[in-house]
From Swiss-Prot:
Domain of life of the organism encoding this protein: Bacteria
Gene name linked to the record: virA
The Response regulatory domain, residue ranges: 716-827
Name of the protein in question: Wide host range VirA protein
Chief location: membrane
CDD domains associated with the record: HisKA (cd00082)
Amino acid sequence: MNGRYSPTRQDFKTGAKPWSILALIVAAMIFAFMAVASWQDNATTQAILSQLRSINADSASLQRDVARAHTGTGRNYRPIISRLGALRKNLEDLKQLFRQSHIVSESNAAQLLRQLEVSLNSADAAVRAFGAQNVRLQDSLASFTRALSSLPGKASTDQTLEKPTELASMMLQFLRQPSPAISFEISLELERLQKQRGLDEAPVRILAREGPIILSLLPQVKDLVNMIQTSDTAEIAEMLQRECLEVYSLKNVEERSARIFLGSASVGLCLYIITLVYRLRKKTDWLARRLDYEELIKEIGVCFEGEAATTSSAQAALRIIQRFFDADTCALRLVDHDRRWAVETFGAKHPKPVWDDSVLREIVSRTKADERATVFRIISSKKIVHLPLEIPGLSILLAHKSTDKLIAVCSLGYQSYRPRPCQGEIQLLELATACLCHYIDVRRKQTECDVLARRLEHAQRLEAVGTLAGGIAHEFNNILGSILGHAELAQNSVSRTSVTRRYIDYIISSGDRAMLIIDQILTLSRKQERMIKPFSVSELVTEIAPLLRMALPPNIELSFRFDQMQSVIEGSPLELQQVLINICKNASQAMTANGQIDIIISQAFLPVKKILAHGVMPPGDYVLLSISDNGGGIPEAVLPHIFEPFFSTRARNGGTGLGLASVHGHISAFAGYIDVSSTVGHGTRFDIYLPPSSKEPVNPDSFFGRNKAPRGNGEIVALVEPDDLLREAYEDKIAALGYEPVGFRTFNEIRDWISKGNEADLVMVDQASLPEDQSPNSVDLVLKTSAIIIGGNDLKMTLSREDVTRDLYLPKPISSRTMAHAILTKIKT
């Protein structure tokens, strides 16, 4: 069993070895370190930018100091020299930093650095030339101013000349804006002063000496100052700074991209490692799950050990499956492959669940159409099964082919919503269901073998009893016939009021009872002659309904319900009559107060074989005769013995124990089967399955020859039947019974016929001919005569003597004997 139904052991490939996972962890750490580590030399870059900013500042300061020295406001040239030194030092530091950085080799910074060096060299040369010439110029201006101020004249005092003159005015103008014209005029004025008499010669000589110097140096100094002021050192430094920032930004972008890539790679490796570890964990859990499944199979096998019933064993197994899959409910249903009818239902809890037939048929159809032979669905629990307790949430529904004829449908119910299970869990559920179905099939076969063994033992016991009874029955019948014959002779020769007549009646009554017992014994021995003919069970039951009513106490009500389908079987109606009488009498004896006996005739189809207490019923079509009562029921301990000969629970009250034994014999003679279900305190139900016949049924009157139909004396019987052929058949039957038939097609025709003064002793009306506003219960009032209603297949009658005056309802078909008794009864009343 385990070798066949245990899961197939597979090689679970984990996809990674432990050493490979360790290598991936190391790689992830390396990538993470590279992602967070610093790539560029930020300090060098910041130092380069700082040096460039210093060059900008020193260049601006140098231009300021040169401007102050040119205007004469600053006579100290040390700041200028220190600025030049600072610029030189910054340039050397910048070259050193550039050699340490990769920026020079990867950008235009090297060319800009060379331009910056050239610009600084030019500025340095210009400053040095400016320093030498500006000192000489300032000295000449000072001497020129002093000499000019010592001359008398109209010169006005200024910051430069204390006694301005015309010469002073022109010199000031020349200082502000040197030009050749002004220089020429100043030269003419100096010559004039030299030629002018009466002036101090010393100042004039100074003016003549220093004036030309000023006129020649001032334009040169102006040019040097302009050269220094327009130096592109600061501009080149700014360009170099922008270039460095741009290169630095590009490097940052590349570095950021690389960091993102390395970080992503590290994170990806970490996620992959987590996935590998998760898969290893899942596979480990799955292996543990498979081991638990092995234990599940063993536990299911243990449930079917011993002598427990199949239902209780299956229920225990379903509880194990429910616990294994952590479900709240678990149910299994076996469905016929072709008919799509449920054969058996098992549940982990009591009572058994009631399945939704539409969902069941749908999933069975899908299972038949699916080549994989397995259908899995998850839908609402309320759409699958009506559980004894309201289980909200979802149900897992799995169907697969259990055998060639059966489909197993397993349902797991959950109170809370759950995700779809993995394919492995579905496979385990399918295998567990297959294992359970296998055990159920084995137990069923074992039960069938046990039933067949008991049936063989019962048949051997019946054969022994029949052999013994058959040997003495005929001799005993001869003796009993002689006794009854002489008793009847004595009865006819004695007056009715005699005490002896009463004793003789007792003898005859006891003899009749003894004959019944002999008939039952002959039935057990199968030595009684049988007359086999096809007949309708519905017609027979309708025929013997008055006889059944007479055999029962007045406190028992009989209820009949017939199927519209044909219910023809082959056999002896006398035997079926005896079956009905015996079962109904037993039912009435189990009732202490007013009781109800229901007799139902229908068609039944059995999709698979059914195990009964006294045999196995094969699948197929049957005529089902059900007799149920609401009596006290049969105890469970007594139920297996009710068909045994001479077994009786009423031995003290005259029970022989042959009634149900003869019933079993009669049903076996019909090649039928009988199934009994009973609940103590609620009643008993006998289901008699009889094989149907396709032959035309004969009239039951041919079996009841001694019970001749009563005849009439020419009374008029009016008949309303819309079917022409059926109306003619009824008229022939009525005429054969000694009555005068008058047929009508519609109810209005007979009403018009009576309104014209015609009279009828009895009216028979087909229910189909009644108008919609005409109630069947008021036909006799409308037609002012007794009426019999014909039609329908349901017969609900209480044939007590107090009800003979009420309307009589006859179901179709109507036998001649039934019609004769009904007409005679209504005419007499």
